[in-house]
Amino acid sequence: MEKIKQIIKKIPILSDIAKPIYRHFLGRKLNPTYWISEIVRKPNAMVVQIGSNDGFHGDPINVLLKKNSSWKCLLVEPVPYLFERLRQNYGNSARFKFVNAAINDGETAKFYWVDQSAKQHIPDLPWWYDQLGSFNRDHIKSKFNGVLEPYIVSRDIQGIRLPDLLTREGIEHIDVLHIDTEGYDWKILSQLDLRKFNPTIILYEHIHLPIQEKQASIQFLKERYLLYYLGQDIMAINKRAYKAELLTLYTLRCKE
């Protein structure tokens, strides 16, 4: 791939033609929605999403749930106003379960997020500012040179462990597990019993993980899964899954 890129760069006409094609191809390669739709072929797939936000902005699962009318999903979001948006965006279909909770070790803990009034006072905030929910206040404070600090709010939340949540909600199998929790991803993923639940795809955010936790997550999964970097995420594809050894994904493989 690198050799091809170098050859194209040396020929201006080829470069002008190839650049948009390459960008389109790379964009598809980095899009988890594309790969989930390619690999998960079950008509009645079960999705578990931890950190659902509003179920729309920047959500790789939303379009799949709308396209596949028999897919079911457990959607978990701790921030109250985002949870209400989440319910509104998906409606009252029986195939969706909504849980307003945070996944941790089961203890009561203070959870922090950005008040929605921040956008009124700082209009140029990016659309994803309200995705900054965390058990770590400093994680939010560190964003945008600290301008969000006056708008950080908190609430004591009764946490729940992932196994307890799955048992309580009657989840017996998982086809797709998506975790997006601002640096808490490994702590949640590590609670998954891979002997009981063996998802076809696990998608989680690595960008905010300490290097030790990122490496631990890879070690945890690599026996059963092929691991790929998709931008800020790692996508784990079960080795037994359809098209698990996709050649077009090879260059994105995790090497740790």
Model-derived features: where do they sit?
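Phosphate/nucleotide-binding beta-alpha loop and adjacent structural elements of enzyme active sites
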Residues: 1-256
